[in-house]
Amino acid sequence: MNMQSNAPTGSTAPLNERFTLVLLAHDQSTALRRALRHYRDSSFAMLVIDSSSLINADITVEFPSVQYLHAPTAIGFGDKVRQAVERVATPYLAIADAESFLLPQALDQSLRFLEAHAEYGACQGYSLAFEAHADRVDYYLLDRKGCEDYSGASAEARLAVFAEDCPSLVSALTRTETLRRSYASLPVGFDSRLQEAGHCLGLVTDAKVRLLDIPYGVHERSRVAKPRNPVGTAPGTEDLRAVAEQERMSTMLADAFGAAASAREHVRAILKKLVERSVPQTGKVLESTWDSRRGEPVRRFESTQYVELPFYNQAFFDVLASLEFLLHAAPSGQVQLKELEAVMLQQKELSRPQRNTNAEPLDEQLARAFLSYAFNQDLVKQLLEVMQAKGDKRYVQMLQAWEQRLKAAAFENTARLFDATRSGQLLRWLEAREPSASETQKVSKYLAARNGGPTFGILILDLDADIFKMQATFDSVINGYCRAFKIVVFTTGDLPAETTPQSVLHFVKVNESNYVDKINQVVSQSDCDWMVMAEAGDELTPSGLFRAGVELLAAPQCQAVAMDEFQRQPDGTLADVFRPGFNLDLLQSTPALMARHWLVRRETLVKLGGYSREFKNAMEFDLLLRLVEQDGLGGLAHLDEPLLICQAPAVEDNADERKTLLRHLAVRGYQADVSAVVPGTHKIDYRFAERPLVSIIVHGIGDLTALQRCLLSVLQRTRYQRYEVLVPTGAANHSVLRTWLDGQGHQASRVRLLDIGPGVATGSWINAASQEAKGDYLVTLVADSEVLNVNWIESLLNQALRPEVGVVGAKLVERDGRITQAGLILGLNDEVGSAFIGEPKTARGYMNRLVVEQNCSAVSFACLMISKQLFNAADGIDSELFDDALGDVDLCLRVGQAGYLTVWTPHVQVIQSGVLASTPEARAALREKWSEALAQDRFYNGNLALQGAGFTLGPVRNVPWTDLLV
C-alpha cells in the first residue's frame, strides 16, 4: 500500500504529522527497547520495522504511541525501507538501526532545514561510532569534515562532489516522496551493505543534500564498520564474488538513475567507498569509563582529536552521559555482553558469604563488586541491605538514590542477563550439585562410620607467592563440605606461620629448583590416602571432594581418578571441561586438558617414585604415563563431577609434554615421532615398519556414478601401494563397470569385482567379502564416499597396527569441509549419533575433539579399518540382528568388550553424508543387547546433554547423594 501524505507540510503542524522516525530491528529486543526509551520524550511519530522471526508483541503495550510492524521476510536493509515508505504517512522520515541513537534536537534542526529549503531532499549532521564495553564506552571517528552542501544543479554535478567524501546518508532525515521515488528504481536482491550504498546514491541523485554542522547521532560500531577481511578471505586479498556483486550493483544503479556516461564512474567510485567504509582502531576519539561512585562517566581523550567537528561542547557530552547510562543499564552489544559475563561472574562470586573467618568481609566484597559494574540490581539490593545493617548512612543514601535511578529506567534486571550466559548456567548447574542439610548430615554420618572416609592431601603450588590467590583457594576449601583434608602450600614467598607436616595447613618454603623434591618429600611423609595437585588461585567446588570421598570407598582398585573442572578463560568467563571416561588417546593427544588435577592414591604416587624433576612442566602427565607403563589401564578411572575451578591452560606447545610422551612411547616399544598439528596438542606417528596388504571393501552401492567417483578417489589419491579393492556387482552392471575400469589405467587392476546376488545386505556382503579378501587388514568404505587425503591408509594403519587397538574410524565431511560424522556417541538423541555435525572445517571442537585422535565407543562402516584376524575372531558382523543397520556399532562394542580400543582419527578425511543406517528392528536389537552401554557411553561425560548437537551442558540436576550411600 503506497500511502500519500495528507498532513500539512508547514512547521505549524504537530510534529507527529510532519516527521516519522523509523527504527529497523532484527533480533535486537533489548536494543530496540533501549532506543525507544531514548526517544520517549519526543513527539514525532515512530514506526518499528522488525524482521525478527518472533513477534515482539509487548512493544506496543510498553510504548502505545509506537507503530510496530513485524516483517520476518524483510531481512535486508532495502526490504525494511520499502516496508517503511509504504506505511509512513508524514512528509518526512529518518531511518535508524535499533542499536543507533539519533539526537532529537538534531532531527528537529534537520527537519526545519528541509521545510525551509524545498530544493533539498535530505539533511543530517555529523555522527560518531561507539563500542560499548562492560565498564566504558569507546567513541570512534565516523564522519569527517568535508563538503557540507551538495547543491549542484544536476545529479552528475552532485555525484562528482559527493564522490570526494561519501558520507553515509543512511540515517539522514529525508523527504518521504524522495525515498519513494528512489526505491521505485533501486535494484533488489543485494546484501544490506550494497543496499545501504544504493540508498545513499539514490538520495544524492534525486535532490540536493545538506550536512549541518551539528552533532546528529551515534551508531554502534559493528553496524557501520566493515570487517577487516570477509570470512574465508586471506588478508590482503579481495572477495572476488563481492567485487563482482559490487560491479553489478553500480551498473544497475547507473541505469536506474539514468546517469550519464560521465557520471557512471562517480557511481562506481561512490559505491566502492561506501561499501568499504570502516572504522579503524586508529580513529578512536575518546574513552568514557563509568564511575560507579559518582554515577557518571569519566572521559579520557585520545592524543589525536578532530576539533573541526561539532562534538566538543558540554551539551553534547551531557547527551552522551545519558546515552551511556542507557547502554550500561540495558547492555546488548556482543563485545559488551561477553565482557559483562566475566564481570558479573566475579560479582556473583564476591556476593557469596565466606565460611572462612579470615576471608575478606562481605561488605568489602560487595563494595568491590559494585565498583566493577553498578547496574546489577540484585547486587545493589544486597549491598544496600548489608550497608543498612552496618549503619553506614552516607553509603546507604548513595545506594538508595542509585537504586531509584535504576528502577526509573524500567529496564529488565541485568542480573538476568548473567543467568543466560555460559558462566551463569555453569554456576547454577554447580549449585544444584550441592547436598541439602539433611543429605550433608547423612553423608557425614556415613563417612564417620567408615573411619571418616578417605583423606585428601591438597598440594598447592604457589611459585608466584601470591597471597590473594592463596586466599581464594583457602576460602574455597573452607566453603566446601569435605572436612577430611590437609593442605600443604609450596611457596616461594615468606612463610606466614610456623607449621608442621601434621598440621591441617602446612607451609613449605621452596624455590624453582627444588619444589618437585619438596613435593615428593611431603607426599612420602603424608598420612593422607589421596593426593591432588593444584595451583594458587584454583578453587575447589563445594561438593567435589565430598562426593569423591563417598565414591572412592567403593573403588579400592582405583589408583588414580580424573574429575571434571570449570576453567577461567583469558576473557574471564567460565568454560566447562567435562572429561570422558579414561581415554588413553585423548590423554596422549591433549594432556593440558586431560592430565591435570587427578586424585592419585598416595601409596601409588610413592611407589612410582613421585613426580619427576625432568618434566616439571608436565609432572602430572608424566606420572600418569608411568602409571600406565607399570599397571596398564585398569586402575585409572573418572568421576563425572567437577572438582575445581581453575585457570585455563595456555594454548601453546609444551616441550616437557612432548619429551615425556616420547619417553613413554619408547617404553612401549615405539620409535615414534610426536608433532603438533594444532598448538597445545600432540599427533603421534608410531612409525611402524610393517606394510601389510589392505583390502578395501566397498559397500552400499546404489548409484553407478557415485561408485565410479568413489573408486577414482581411491585409485588416484592413495599413496599406499599395498591394497586391493573389492566391489560387489550383479549381472546387470558387471560388464558396464568392467568396461569402465578397463579405461582407468593400470591402477584399476587393484579392483576385484565379486559377483553377488541382488538384495544382499551390507552386513552379509562385508562378511562375504572378508573371506575373499587377501589383505591382513580390512577397510569398509561406503560407495557414495570419496577419500580426500593421500595418506589415508597410512593414517588408519598408524592406529590399527597398535596391539591395543581394534577398530579405527575416519572423519566424515561435506565437500566444503563441514563435519558430518566424528565418531559415534551411544545414546545421543535416543539412538546412536555423532556430535559436531555442521561444524566448519576450522573448528577444534569441544576439548579439541575435532582435531586430535581419541578413543570412542564406535565408528561407522562409512570408513572403518580392522585387522582381518580380529574381524574373524569376533565372528564378523552379526548378520542375524544387524545385517541392514548398526552392524558397525555392534562390532565396535564387541571388540571393545574383548579389551581392544576403538580410535577415531581426524587425519583421515572422507567426503560422505555421515547418515547412519538404522531400522526399527536394528535399534530394538541394539537396545536389548547393549542396554548398559547405551545408558551411558563411557567416552561421553554423563553431565553433557544427550539431546541436540552433543557436548553441550546437560540439564540441571541434583546428585543422588542418598543413593551413593551403599
Predicted feature locations:
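A recurrent flexible, glycine/aromatic-enriched loop bordering the glycosyltransferase active site
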Residues: 153-174, 575-603, 771, 827-869
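Short aromatic/hydrophobic "clamp" motif used to bind/position activated sugar donors
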Residues: 93, 531, 778
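Non-catalytic membrane-proximal stalk/linker segments that position and tether the catalytic domains
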Residues: 1-16, 281-456, 461-468, 472-473, ...
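A short, conserved alpha-helix in the catalytic core of glycosyltransferases
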Residues: 178-182, 189-212, 604, 614-635, ...
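Glycine-rich, basic loop-to-helix element that forms the pyrophosphate-binding segment
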Residues: 71-88, 510-526, 756-773
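Conserved donor NDP-sugar-binding/catalytic core segment of glycosyltransferases
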Residues: 107-140, 543-574, 633, 786-830
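Active-site donor/metal-binding and catalytic loop motifs
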Residues: 128-136, 170, 185, 205-235, ...
